[in-house]
Amino acid sequence: MLLSKITFFERFEHDILSGTKTITLRDEAESHVITGQILPVSTFETDRWFCDIQIIDVTPVKLTELTEVHAKQENMTLPQLCDVIAEIYPGLEQLFMIRFRILSQ
């Protein structure tokens, strides 16, 4: 079943709105989106809407395959990105990279 919305931690809101965060790494349960799909974006903590995004593509990627390029697309260093992934998805190796663009407000 396709996702009907997507949430991000509040700490990522500014990076998304400024266009410096252009991907999100998710587990399989949160990877069910398709190219071209438009999703409302809300904060995880309070479910407050703050923008809409359009999905560019979805690509499987293993934790061990993450590079500085992925980190830059997340607006982080690679060690920061690996720490965040370990915090959110402890022990998970298989991720899905969802590339997106923010739609005009």
Curated annotation (Swiss-Prot):
Keywords: Hydrolase
Entry's EC annotation: 3.5.1.135
A molecular function GO annotation: N4-acetylcytidine amidohydrolase activity
Catalytic activity: N(4)-acetylcytidine + H2O = cytidine + acetate + H(+); N(4)-acetyl-2'-deoxycytidine + H2O = 2'-deoxycytidine + acetate + H(+); N(4)-acetylcytosine + H2O = cytosine + acetate + H(+)
Domain ASCH residues, every copy: 7-93
GO cellular component, one term: cytosol
Active-site residue list: K21 (proton acceptor), T24 (nucleophile), E74 (proton donor)
InterPro entries to which the protein is assigned, alphabetical: AC4CH, ASCH_domain, PUA-like_sf
UniProt KW Hydrolase keyword: yes
Family the UniProt entry places it in: Belongs to the N(4)-acetylcytidine amidohydrolase family.
Role, per record: Catalyzes the hydrolysis of N(4)-acetylcytidine (ac4C).
HAMAP family: ac4C_amidohydr
Name of the protein: N(4)-acetylcytidine amidohydrolase
Provenance organism: Shewanella baltica (strain OS223)
